[in-house]
Structures are given as C-alpha cells and as structure tokens.
A protein has these predicted regions:
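Detector for outer-membrane/organellar transmembrane beta-barrel domains
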Residues: 186-306, 316-321, 355
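Outer membrane beta-barrel
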Residues: 21-36, 50-175, 183, 191-199
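Extracellular loop and loop/strand-boundary signature of outer-membrane beta-barrel proteins
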Residues: 47-51, 143-144, 175-176, 243-247, ...
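Transmembrane beta-barrel architecture of outer-membrane proteins
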Residues: 58-62, 98-101, 152-154, 184-186, ...
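Structural signature of outer-membrane beta-barrel domains
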Residues: 33-37, 84-88, 121-125, 175-177, ...
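N-terminal signal peptide c-region/cleavage motif recognized by signal peptidases
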Residues: 14-19
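Outer-membrane beta-barrel "beta-signal"
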Residues: 307, 311, 340-357
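Residue-level detector of the transmembrane beta-barrel scaffold of outer-membrane proteins
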Residues: 25-27, 76-78, 113-115, 167-169, ...
C-alpha cells in the first residue's frame, strides 16, 4: 500500500496568505526469482548449468520517493528519487544512491513539462508499451538490444508531453567535459500514437562513449501494436550502429521482435515472443568466434498470475540459438548470461514473485 503524507509548503512564511500542499509518496517493487540456465561458461572455461536466485525478473526491484505540488493555473512541480534493490542479497546496485532516477520537473497542463536530472532516455519511455513482456522483463527479453546500456543518463534535460493519444519525448544529456561539449553527451526523441485498436511508436537515440570500446552509438526504432479483444500483438524493428575501437565489437545490428500477450482470464496472462538479431562485428579476427558471427534467435514464453492488484506470480522460459540468453554476448553482457565454448544455444527457466507497494 502506498504511504502518503500531506506537507504544507510555506511553513514559517508569515506573509503567505495561503500555502500549497505537497503530496509525498513512498513506493516500491519487490521482485525475486529462482532460475536454471544451461550451457553457461564455467570458471575453468567449460560448460555447466547455472542455478541461482536473482532479483528483478519481471520488474526491477526498487524503492522510491515521489512528490508533487499543484502550483495553480495548471502548473505543477514534481520530484522523484528512486533506488535499485537486489532482493536476493539486500544490496543496492553499482555505486548505490538513487541509481534509477533523480529528477526535478515543472509542467503545465496542455503544454507538457521539462525534467532535469538522472532519468530514462526518450526511446526507453516510448517503447516500454511495445516490449512484448510489457515493461522490459529481464526473463527473458533482450532488453540490451532494444534500449541500449545508456537507457538511463545523467545530467539530462527532457521534454515530455501527452496530448490525448499522442505522446512526445525529447532529451539532451550534457557530457560535462571542459572544452569538449559533445564528449559523453546524449540525445534522442520519440513519439507514440496510442489509438483504440492500433498503436505505433518511433524513436531515435544518440550517445557518445556510453559503453566500453565504443565512441559513438546511435539507434532508431519503430514498432506497432494491435489490440483485438483480449490479445495484444506487437512487432518492432531497430537498427543500431557504432564507432568502435576494438576488433570483434558489434559495429552494426538489425534487431527484430514480435509476439503476443493474451489475457486468458482477468488474473492469468500468457506471453509468447520471438527475437532475431542480424549482427555485424568490427574487424573480426579470422579463425576466431568473432569472425562471421551467426545471427542469434530466441523464443520466450511466460505466464503471469495476479494474486491481487499488487501481487504477481510468474514463470518464464527462454531458448537462444547461437547466442547467450538475451543475446548477452552481443549486447555488452547486459544481464550476465554467457554461452560456453562449443555450445550452440542456451535455455533458461525461472519461477518468481513480484509485489508492488
């Protein structure tokens, strides 16, 4: 259950004739799962089965604080601070802090708004509804191919607006390097039209130095969804290209995805998806695994059962051909899966639970 407090703004300002009220909400998601994955590379460079507990299989585990204040005449001020949690060990992610988001925004009804700080890219925002798993589920969707490693960026200014069925996003992230304005900077934009039966989305993302061995990465994507009755059919395409500094690193790719979400009952949802990636490597070394890579494919199946509006049980399975699960060996080890030498594919199955509050 969300906890809310009402705090008066202008406390101690005797000259204020009236004080606005700030609505503060503490919220979070707890998501934990147990997983079995085949053909993982062992420390001795062999092949083995991985059995582990993980966090954030359906949605990333997190806690956060958000606050909003109505300023009058349609104006509104917002702030959000959000931090990751690893449910299997209780730790944070990376350097800690509010890694998932830390931004302050100002908006006006009918105009849209602007947010400042660490936040998601425009492409991430727009394509969330065109993820077959409905929100970039790591079990098992190649999120790295869709949104990239830079799906959150620091020092960002983002414009957002929702005009009925049309949503717009655009952002710029400052690199902050003296004498080199574009170094480490990022930019992007996207739009979505969500009609009653059909939805379409398109987006572009550009970033300098977002991942190791890459000096410039750009991607553009388009997707569509059809909602006939209890089913949602989704298909998308993304092209990415990079300026790289190391042989064997992905320099260009074409990524395709398609799938369906089907509401079997009000509590039960079935998901099926297919993913394919056409990969080109920079200066591959002859006679090595990086020379002429086989284009990977993956099939994903998932079942979600809602225990309540905020509690969910899920089971997921995936099989990847010619790649690690979620194409991790081509997507900069986005989720930590590997593929043992001499193996042609990898399978995974997981059972988990998610609770929102």
């Amino acid at each position: 259950m969300k906890k809310q407090w009402l705090a008066a703004c202008g406390v101690g300002l005797a000259s204020a004739g009236a004080s606005a009220q700030t609505n503060v909400t503490l919220y979070g998601v707890a998501d934990i799962y147990t997983e079995v994955v085949t053909h993982q590379q062992t420390p001795a460079q062999g092949s083995g089965t991985l059995v582990r507990m993980g966090s954030g299989g359906r949605s990333g585990s997190r806690w956060g604080i958000k606050a909003a204040e109505e300023l009058g005449d349609g104006w509104r001020a917002d702030v959000r601070l959000e931090s990751s949690i690893l449910m299997n060990n209780g730790r944070g992610v990376g350097t800690g802090g509010f890694d998932r988001g830390a931004w302050l925004g100002l908006s006006r009804q009918g105009w849209g708004g602007v947010r400042f700080g660490r936040q998601y890219t425009s492409l991430f925002d727009i394509f969330e509804h065109y993820s077959v798993t409905d929100g970039y589920s790591t079990l098992y969707e190649p999120d790295g191919a869709i949104v990239g490693l830079n799906f959150r960026e620091n020092n960002m200014v983002k414009y957002y607006a929702d005009f009925g069925r049309l949503s717009l996003r655009a952002h710029y992230s400052f690199g902050g390097t003296p004498g080199a304005f574009s170094a480490g900077a990022g930019s992007g934009f996207g739009f979505e039209y969500a009609g009653g039966l059909v939805g379409i989305a398109a987006g572009y993302d550009d970033v300098n130095g977002a991942v190791p061995n890459v000096t410039h990465f750009r991607r553009y994507a388009i997707a569509a969804a059809i909602h006939p009755g209890p089913a949602t059919f989704i298909a998308g395409f993304e092209h990415g290209s990079a300026n790289v500094t190391t042989p064997g690193v992905v320099t260009r790719f074409d990524f395709y995805w398609a799938g369906v979400r089907y509401r079997v009952t009000p509590a039960l949802q079935a998901i099926g998806a297919f993913y394919y990636e056409n990969v080109v490597l920079q200066n591959p070394s002859p006679g090595t695994a990086s020379a002429g890579p086989s284009n990977p494919k993956q099939v994903t199946l998932e079942m979600d059962y809602s225990l309540s509006k905020s509690a969910l049980l899920y089971v997921a399975a995936g099989y990847a051909w010619r790649a690690a699960l979620d194409f991790d060996n081509y997507n900069y080890n986005f989720l930590g899966y590997s593929l043992a030498s001499g193996r042609s594919g990898s399978a995974g199955v997981a059972l988990g639970m998610r609770k929102q509050f």
